[in-house]
């Protein structure tokens, strides 16, 4: 009989010393993105301009991370948000201008599809590890806990509780207010995570009664389910980008190129375990794919 005792240990105890700070990853991702996507033979192209503006939003994220770490630097926080809002406004204008462009030649990446596949696989593995050991979003943990509460209630008691009470719980725990369907997105992962952790505790004779098993395993269930949901969200985004390019443009290599660019964005690594960011992006993307 195989016991999944590995799930009861923090991932940072398994992968000791695996840590890349934001400045290092910012530098490496910038260098890789420029080397792969920048057209050095045609510098004055719209693609190069888009790449520069896309990567140019990364310092704003770093400013926000530093301001959150210090909790005192209000200037960095304000400057970071102004930078992000300005960059978002530029991309809104850019998308509105895109249908008016008559000539948009396709420019291939500076690496062949085989190398792009190897690089994308390595980056996806790195992103999964970061989501497994990095800081998890409080909204994801709160959603998993609410999903667990739903699973423990009977159908009659669940139907009697209005949805605004769930929103109040999320707002109390995270400071944000989500809709009543937010825990449902995490329930698919919360159910097997609950069964996996509780069965492991029972098999190891950590606790005896079922009720005590649930109480002991609840924090571990929330962490595992939130991280697993974030990982599945990233995988859904990768496959969505590839399939969107294949179905809408008939170019599988283009989808692979876009997916690797997503994996190179420092933002994806900075908040790898934030389900409130990843799931929203995955749902928006798949609404375009289908």
Where are these regions (language model features)?
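Membrane-embedded, hydrophobic transmembrane alpha-helices
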Residues: 2-134
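Transmembrane-helix motifs of polytopic, lipid-linked glycan transferases
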Residues: 224-248
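Aromatic-rich transmembrane-lumenal/periplasmic boundary elements in polytopic membrane proteins
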Residues: 115-184, 188
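Short hydrophobic/aromatic helix or loop-helix immediately within or flanking a transmembrane segment
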Residues: 163-228, 232
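Short juxtamembrane and helix-loop transition motifs at transmembrane-helix boundaries
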Residues: 8-17, 38-40, 213-222, 237-243, ...
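Short acidic/glycine- and proline-prone juxtamembrane loop motifs at membrane-interface regions
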Residues: 270-279
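Specific aromatic-rich, kink-prone transmembrane helix
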Residues: 280-290
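Transmembrane-helix signature of polytopic, membrane-embedded enzymes
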Residues: 242-264
């Amino acid at each position: 009989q195989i016991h999944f005792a590995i799930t009861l240990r923090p991932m940072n105890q398994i992968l000791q010393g695996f840590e890349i700070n934001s400045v290092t990853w910012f530098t490496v991702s910038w260098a890789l993105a420029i080397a792969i996507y920048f057209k050095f033979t045609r510098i004055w192209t719209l693609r190069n301009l888009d790449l520069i503006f896309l990567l140019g939003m990364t310092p704003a994220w770093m400013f926000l991370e530093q301001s959150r770490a210090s909790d005192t630097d209000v200037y960095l926080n304000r400057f970071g948000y102004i930078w992000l809002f300005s960059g978002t406004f530029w991309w809104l204008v850019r998308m509105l201008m895109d249908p008016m462009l008559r000539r948009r030649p396709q420019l291939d990446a500076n690496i062949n599809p085989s190398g792009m596949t190897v690089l994308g696989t390595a980056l996806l593995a790195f992103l999964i590890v970061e989501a497994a050991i990095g800081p998890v979003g409080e909204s994801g943990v709160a959603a998993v806990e609410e999903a667990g509460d739903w699973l423990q209630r009977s159908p009659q008691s669940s139907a009697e509780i209005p949805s605004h009470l769930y929103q109040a719980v999320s707002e109390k725990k995270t400071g944000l207010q989500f809709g009543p369907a937010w825990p449902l997105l995490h329930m698919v992962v919360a159910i097997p995570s609950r069964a996996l952790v509780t069965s492991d505790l029972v098999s190891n004779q950590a606790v005896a009664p079922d009720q005590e098993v649930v109480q002991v395993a609840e924090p571990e269930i929330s962490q595992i389910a939130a991280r697993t949901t974030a990982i599945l969200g990233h995988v859904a985004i990768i496959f969505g980008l590839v399939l969107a390019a294949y179905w809408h443009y008939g170019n599988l290599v283009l989808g692979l190129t876009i997916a690797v660019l997503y994996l190179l964005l420092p933002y994806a690594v900075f908040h790898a375990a934030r389900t409130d960011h990843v799931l929203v992006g995955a749902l928006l993307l798949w609404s375009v794919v289908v």
